[in-house]
Amino acid sequence: MSRVGIVLLNLGGPERIQDVGPFLYNLFADPEIIRLPIPALQKPLAWLISTLRSNKSQEAYRSIGGGSPLRRITDQQARELQSLLRQRNVDATTYVAMRYWHPFTESAVADMKADGIEQVVVLPLYPHFSISTSGSSFRELQRLRQGDERFAQLPLRAIRSWHDHPGYLKAMAQLMEREIDACVDPSTAHVFFSAHGVPKSYVEEAGDPYQKEIESCAELIMKTLGRDNPWTLAYQSRVGPVEWLQPYTEEALEELGEKGVKELVVVPISFVSEHIETLEEIDIEYREIATEAGVSNFRRVPALDIDPTFIASLADLVETSLAGPEVDLDEAAALPARTKLYPQEKWSWGWNNSSEVWNGRLAMLGFSAFLVELISGHGPLHALGLL
């Protein structure tokens, strides 16, 4: 078998406090995250937002030790996956490709070429597809592929989504079972799935399958778990004034407390490794909200990290992909046929249907409101502590 390069896609995270500002800048400079009517404003606005949010974000990272463990854990996952694939007689080398912090996608591509890789499998470390996560990373990889003849010649396969893979579901269920069994009354402990949210317009206007995959995944995990515990699915990490997927985690926690729920097992469903959203947002912020609402036993299921069952499921995904056809990254990033996602260089702005729909009317209104708020010094972003 030819030499296979496994590209593990992930978000990236600041490893030191001084990295927080540059990381945020890279994040908000991505047109997949914020699309502006005038492209020249992208970088200035990214600088402004990252500057305004740096102090608050730095405080959050200080509370978990001064930086994100995401790169360290992703590197461990890469090593474990590479080792297992080689045990299965697959001549594979893994490469970590972060979207917004080191090691960037360009580094992974350069390393693969230097190592003489002969074919590529792209594996997002996002179980559920979204245009803002896997989609953005696919597009970045495709951009590099189009500008690099040698890289473009390599046969490539990409795994778009794996939220329903039996091995992944089993790994999640096993970790949940341990926390449920540790409750005073395991049979009545309330299972609380918390997924990273996205703006509602992504789903309703652009046709992003993320919500559908999250909901299906939660049901499949509970079916795999084989228990009758009551459960809830909510969405966390909302920022800004626009409407995101609901119910919001903080509001759902308060509601469960009001209903008398005492034992809660929180499951970070869309996260495969520990990072700021699990260690700070769930473990600190949401724990406090739940406790104040009356929950007396707040237990959080650990992220998958290098769980053997999880790593084995990733290896299964790679082997299945290698046995299948090559994949075009543009097709891997595509949305349902009912909505056309235009190439970034052809996106238009305005009230017509040729605009990028999920960045259309809401974004236009949001951008106008943002400018007004910057000038006035008052508004919802100030109330939320974002400005």
Swiss-Prot record:
> Where does this protein chiefly localize?
cytoplasm
PROSITE patterns attached to this UniProt entry: FERROCHELATASE
Listed under catalytic activity are:
heme b + 2 H(+) = protoporphyrin IX + Fe(2+)
Against InterPro entries, the record matches this protein to: Ferrochelatase, Ferrochelatase_AS, Ferrochelatase_C, Ferrochelatase_N
Question: What biological-process terms (Gene Ontology) are attached?
Answer: heme biosynthetic process
- Which EC number(s) does the record attach to this protein? 4.98.1.1
Q: Which GO cellular component term is one of those annotated? A: cytoplasm
Record Pfam families: Ferrochelatase
| Keywords per UniProt | Cytoplasm, Heme biosynthesis, Iron, Lyase, Metal-binding, Porphyrin biosynthesis
Report the SUPFAM superfamilies cross-referenced here.
Answer: Chelatase (SSF53800), Chlorophyll a-b binding protein (SSF103511)
UniProt entry tagged with the keyword Metal-binding? yes
Kindly indicate where the leader peptide sits in this chain.
none
Q: In which pathway does it act?
A: Porphyrin-containing compound metabolism; protoheme biosynthesis; protoheme from protoporphyrin-IX: step 1/1
Query: Which compartments does it reside in?
Result: Cytoplasm
- Annotated residues for binding of Fe cation: 196, 277
* Gene Ontology molecular function: ferrochelatase activity; metal ion binding
Similarity annotation: Belongs to the ferrochelatase family.
Q: What does this protein do?
A: Catalyzes the ferrous insertion into protoporphyrin IX.
Instruction: Write the protein's name.
Output: Ferrochelatase
Species annotation: Synechococcus sp. (strain RCC307)
Query: What gene name is listed for this protein?
Result: hemH
